[in-house]
Structure formats: C-alpha cells, structure tokens
C-alpha cells in the first residue's frame, strides 16, 4: 500500500495534512532530529515520526533523504498543510470544484489509494493531485498526462531511484526539476483532477520559507531553464508585479512548463481502460 510521507519543519501544531487520514491508517511525518520530541508529543498518536539528521539541507535535501529511506516502496509525499479532497463539476460554469468543507471518508480515502495504485501499475511512477489555481473544465477530464503541479507528489520507488528523480541537484523548485528530469527519461507524469487539494497559505512561517528568497528562487529557476530550455520557458508578463518572497529588490522570475504531447503514453492507454478520462 502507498505510504503517505509528510516532510515538516518548524510546524509543530500546524500539520493539517493529518486531518485527511482515517484512524486505521498511519502516515509518516519526517522531521529533523532536534524536533523529534516536539512532533512526537503533538502527533505521536496519529502518525509515525521519522527523523533525518539536523544537517540535511533544506526541503530539497529532505526530499532526497525521503527517497533514499523509502527505496523500494510506493510513497506519496504531501506538504504538511495540504489535504486531498473529492472534486465535482459545477454545471453553471463547467468548473471543477474542490470540496473545501469535507475531508475524504474512510471509503473515499482507500478508493484514492487504489486509484493511484492502479496508475502506478499502469506505468505512472510519479504524479500528483492538482491544486486548483486555474479553472479546470470538464474538457480536461479526470486527469491529464505530463501536467506540472506541486504540494504533493507520488513515487513508485520500486521503479525509480533517488538518482533518477534528482532531488538534491537543485536547492529550490526541486519538484519542478524532478518533474522535468523524469519526463525526459521517458517516465510520464499523471496529474489528477478527480481528486484536488486544499493547501495552506504560501510562504507561511517555517518550512521552506525559512531558506527561500527571491534571489535563491531565481537562481534555481535559471538552472532549470539551462537544463530544460525547451520545456521550462521564461514567462515575462507581470514579473514586476509578482509577490516577493523576501524583502529584496530582485523581481521574482517565473517559468512556464511546455511539455504537453499529442501522442499519449502506453501508461495513459492502460489507465484509461481501467479509469476513463472522460467526466461522468
């Protein structure tokens, strides 16, 4: 069964991701050694607390450590302020909406697990449930291939190695790097719309915000652009208006993903035969 893994740092008392799990499922929270007791006291009855050394570098290093520790397993890494919910189509404007009120029931949670287990069996060794920032219509279907997203990612670590994923090769924007890195090795990515996520406020205190700044963020994007120039392209409009990640003069840069392909993968055809892409 898929193991949910929640990397967390300086967020004792704010791990809202735990709200999505039924009582008979044990998620794992991965924390620095010096925070083990605080997290255990707060969440030990609801999750297994896993430690990594204090000197692990940032969120990218944390994700690398997780892919090392869980080698051979199927995992789903999810931000500590993120929960996965059901979605439905709103007929009046043909918009897919996330259920912001209700968590998954126990039955729905295990259906989600099976849905992604099926995706992995079909060849989708990495994927995510979408954060609905932009409008998702019925024409998008229940999922889309090679569409980038963040806040959560699943991996079949029986099929993918830490080296193949590439965490730790870039300090920030590590999920974007891993997404492109795996696609370019021939591993398609699956973005789910049937299930959507509710996530906390961007750059809340703690977590990766403790090491993020405009300059560090921009240097990471520049590295991604150098390695994947055709698929990670600069978005030039409204850069000056982007919210700053810190009190700096440097404007925040933005990349847009250009990776969609008309020809679908073998994994897509296998998964579509089990779970049709078309909205009911």
Curated annotation (Swiss-Prot):
Protein name in the entry: Beta-glucosyl-HMC-alpha-glucosyl-transferase
Reported function: Transfers a gentiobiosyl-group on a hydroxymethylcytosine residue in DNA. Is involved in a DNA modification process to protects the phage genome against its own nucleases and the host restriction endonuclease system.
Keywords: Glycosyltransferase, Transferase
Pathway named in the protein's UniProt entry: Genetic information processing; DNA modification
A GO molecular-function descriptor: glycosyltransferase activity
Disulfide bonds: none
Any single GO BP term: DNA modification
Enzyme Commission number, as recorded: 2.4.1.-
């Amino acid at each position: 069964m898929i193991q949910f893994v929640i990397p967390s740092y300086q967020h004792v008392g704010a791990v809202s991701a735990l709200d999505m799990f039924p009582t008979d499922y044990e998620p794992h929270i991965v924390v620095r050694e010096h925070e083990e007791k605080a997290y255990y006291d707060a969440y030990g009855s609801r999750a297994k607390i896993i430690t990594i050394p204090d000197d692990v570098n940032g969120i990218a290093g944390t994700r690398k450590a997780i892919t090392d520790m869980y080698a051979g397993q199927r995992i789903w890494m999810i931000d500590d302020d993120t929960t996965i919910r059901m979605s439905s189509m709103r007929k009046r404007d043909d918009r897919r909406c996330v259920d912001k009120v209700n968590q998954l029931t126990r039955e729905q949670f295990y259906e989600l697990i099976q849905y992604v287990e099926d995706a992995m069996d079909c060849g989708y060794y990495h994927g995510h449930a979408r954060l609905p920032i932009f409008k998702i219509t019925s024409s998008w279907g229940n999922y889309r291939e090679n569409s980038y997203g963040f806040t959560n990612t699943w991996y079949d670590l029986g099929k993918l190695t830490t080296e193949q994923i590439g965490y730790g090769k870039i300090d920030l924007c590590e999920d974007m790097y891993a997404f492109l890195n795996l696609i370019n090795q021939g591993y398609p990515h699956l973005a789910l719309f049937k299930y959507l996520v509710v996530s906390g406020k961007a750059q809340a205190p703690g977590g990766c915000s403790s090491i993020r700044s405009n300059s560090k963020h921009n240097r990471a994007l520049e590295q991604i652009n150098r390695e994947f120039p055709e698929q990670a392209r600069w978005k030039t409009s409204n850069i000056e208006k982007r919210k700053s990640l810190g009190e700096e003069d440097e404007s925040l840069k933005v990349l847009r993903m250009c990776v969609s392909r008309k020809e679908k993968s073998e994994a897509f055809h296998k998964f579509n035969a089990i779970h049709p892409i078309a909205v009911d």
